[in-house]
Amino acid sequence: GVQTNITVHVADYAQKYADDKILQYINENIAGKNLSDMELMKKIAAYPASFDYGASHSGYVSMIIYGNGDCWASTSTIIRTCELLGIDAWSRNGNKDYGAGSGHMNTMVYYDGKYYELEAGYSGTAPRYYSAEERDSLFCFHDKDDGTLSIYQYDGQLTSGDTLEIPATYQGKTVTEIEDQFSQGSNRTCGTIHLPDTITKIGAFAFSGFEQATSINIPASVKEIGTGAFAQCLSLENFECTGMGNNYASQNGILYSCDKKIAISGPAVNNPQFASGVQQIAEGAFSYNTNLVKIVIPESVTTIEDAAFFDCYSVKNVTIKGTDITFGSNVFYNCSELTLRGTVGSAVETYANENGIAFRDIQEPPKNGLYQEGDSWNYY
């Protein structure tokens, strides 16, 4: 008999239907129309605005099939239209913009050497309002009462080898602050973060989640760094504290106050080597550092603040050499396999007992409980 090989391509008909509708719109409204760049952007934004707003659908396929969708659906439709046109587009977090609702989303488009922000996610019935704006910066700013600017988001695309270069000025105004949760909605893929010497404040969780960043400079102008500013930066071991009179210092991958009395952040270290004479571990200093396995806290430390080791779930063994320690709340939250080693009768033992944490006398000889750390084996 004759053997015949048959290749069957299975397609999602709903997606094919939606794509055909977009292509029909392109053929009728864009192809061969000799549009300017801005006219093209507006035509792209107009298509999702031709459907009603509806909270039940959040993708382009469901918007086109059911005739309505939310801002996520409008964004999805714009991105798919751009893909079919061979234009680069990506979603943008819009919920920090003035007047925006929680979870709002719109679109960034790169075309012919320019960046555009497209919006078609407004509520109402069709035809809904839409807009296209050429962007002169990929950063987003808020005006401050003192006439300077804070920066709240980056809307561009980065790769692991790129530098995120924070601008010193925008439209003649000085940039002085990185807002809380700058990282939320920002592209977090970069190798280096560079701050200008105009920055005075880095907000809470500002760079949280920049997991591939290995280095950031802290200029002498910085006077305040918020809690968790570098949380979940699991590769960030290089803090470059530059300039005379800097308020901060670094050593062995840990950021300190200038006198090294306060450990402020150690987002990537796995076995922290604390500076001599350190007295305080700041709030959230090592929070979300899943690299941590073993910690020895020197006798000089008298205060461990709230959530200092919050969600460091990989840590197994913490030795606290001091006896008169003040603990904040949730210091070792979600460190479920943790054993604390300290002096019997000390504040360390009391804290362990009150918080359901295993305790072992610091003077107790090693027992037959082995754990592997890198290429070596250690006793509990």
Question: What positions do the PLM features span?
Answer:
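Intrinsically disordered, low-complexity N-terminal segments that are enriched in acidic
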Residues: 1-5
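Secondary-structure boundary elements
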Residues: 13-64
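Sec-exported extracytoplasmic/periplasmic mature domains
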Residues: 27, 31, 46-53, 83-87, ...
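Active-site neighborhood of thiol-dependent amide/isopeptide-bond enzymes
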Residues: 47-105, 110
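Extracellular adhesion/carbohydrate-binding repeat motifs centered on closely spaced tryptophans
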Residues: 95, 99-112, 118, 122-123, ...
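Structural signature of tandem-repeat unit edges
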Residues: 139-147, 159-176, 188-201, 210-224, ...
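Glycine/tyrosine- and acidic-biased, solvent-exposed loop/turn segments at the edges of beta-strands
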Residues: 155, 184-187, 208-209, 232, ...
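Consensus positions within tandem repeat domains that build extended binding/scaffold surfaces
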Residues: 181, 203-206, 227-229, 282-285, ...
